[in-house]
């Protein structure tokens, strides 16, 4: 049987909750994350781990402790009108393990919020500000969550799918 993490039998292998621990058992670097993982997916030679939004800081700390020493970026996707509406994706790299992982959290609502990971990854500062500015996602505990691209008096968040094409008037 092919190892689903390092050599999946199919280009896209998706694991349900019950199979997550089993599928990750040979992937020692991320074992510290196994109790936080809601779902795992292997696609295009990259592992994507889904965690509950309230565990994002713990997941980032566990990944860092596991050897993922480089924060590449964090980005958002608005899946409007679906719920949960927003997907926040963190990309991490381990130079020693020569591996990348993506850690994803899904958040709902018109006033979405998730904890800031700046305490673990200071490099996330401007990325979180950009997501706040363009999507309206609030990062609790962020040291300076202010607009970074749009003028301070700008109304709304232009990358939300429900943002009017003509802008607010």
Regions found by a protein language model. Give the residues of each.
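Terminal low-complexity/charged segments
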Residues: 1-169
């Amino acid at each position: 049987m092919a190892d689903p993490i390092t050599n999946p039998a199919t280009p896209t292998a998706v694991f349900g909750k019950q199979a997550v621990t089993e599928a990750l058992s040979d992937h020692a670097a991320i074992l510290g994350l196994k109790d936080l993982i809601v779902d795992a997916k292997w696609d295009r030679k990259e592992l994507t781990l889904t965690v509950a939004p309230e565990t994002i800081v713990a997941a980032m700390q566990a990944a860092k402790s596991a050897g993922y020493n480089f924060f590449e970026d964090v980005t958002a996707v608005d899946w409007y009108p679906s719920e949960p509406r927003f997907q926040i994706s963190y990309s991490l790299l381990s130079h020693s393990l020569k591996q990348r992982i993506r850690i994803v959290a899904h958040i709902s609502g018109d006033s979405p919020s998730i904890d800031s990971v700046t305490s673990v990854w200071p490099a996330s500062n401007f990325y979180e500000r950009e997501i706040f500015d363009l999507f309206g996602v609030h990062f609790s505990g962020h040291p300076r969550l202010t607009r970074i691209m749009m003028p301070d008096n700008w109304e709304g968040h232009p990358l939300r799918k429900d943002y009017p094409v003509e802008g607010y008037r």
